[in-house]
Amino acid sequence: MQFFTTVVLFAAAAMALPGGQQSRPYDPCPNNLLSVPQCCDTDALGLVGLGCVAPPNNRPASPRAFADCCHASSRRPKCCAVTTGLEASVLCDDPAGF
């Protein structure tokens, strides 16, 4: 009888625990240095992004959504360290999921 009670308690505890991975919102630029999402025309060796603008949705929901909003203006998604405000960004790399 004690064995049955112990098994039932362990089974109940196992069912009460959350299963699987909890979904997190997509972060296109998880790197602390390259944390600014941008849509850029040109990337010169990862040092300077030219023709860069902020995506219409500053935090896209997925890699596909980020690419789609940038491709709508014929640009590519990038993560940059600093934006100059003159459609140029410094230190750019591909975002997460690319």
UniProtKB/Swiss-Prot annotation:
**Which InterPro entries does the record match to this protein?**
Cerato-ulmin_hydrophobin (IPR010636), Hydrophobin_sf (IPR036686)
Signal peptide range in chain numbering? 1-16
Subcellular location per UniProt equals: Secreted; Secreted, Cell wall
Recite the UniProt keywords alphabetically. Cell wall, Conidiation, Disulfide bond, Secreted, Signal, Sporulation
Q: Which family does it belong to?
A: Belongs to the cerato-ulmin hydrophobin family.
Q: Which GO terms describe its cellular component?
A: extracellular region
Highest taxon of the source? Eukaryota
Summarize the subunit comment: Homodimer. Homodimers further self-assemble to form highly ordered films at water-air interfaces through intermolecular interactions.
Question: In which tissues is this gene expressed?
Answer: Expressed in mycelium, conidiating mycelium and aerial hyphae.
Name of the protein: Class II hydrophobin 1
Where it mainly occurs, coarsely classed, is secreted
Q: Which cysteines are joined by disulfide bonds?
A: C29-C79, C39-C70, C40-C52, C80-C92
Give the disruption phenotype, in one or two sentences.
Answer: Leads to increased growth rates, conidiation and enhanced tolerances of conidia to abiotic stresses.
Induction of synthesis: Expression is not affected by carbon nor nitrogen starvation. Expression is induced during Bionectria ochroleuca self interaction.
Show the Pfam families listed in the entry.
Answer: Hydrophobin_2 (PF06766)
Q: Does the keyword Transport apply?
A: no
Does the keyword field hold Iron? no
Sum up the protein's function in the record's words. Answer: Aerial growth, conidiation, and dispersal of filamentous fungi in the environment rely upon a capability of their secreting small amphipathic proteins called hydrophobins (HPBs) with low sequence identity. Class I can self-assemble into an outermost layer of rodlet bundles on aerial cell surfaces, conferring cellular hydrophobicity that supports fungal growth, development and dispersal; whereas Class II form highly ordered films at water-air interfaces through intermolecular interactions but contribute nothing to the rodlet structure.
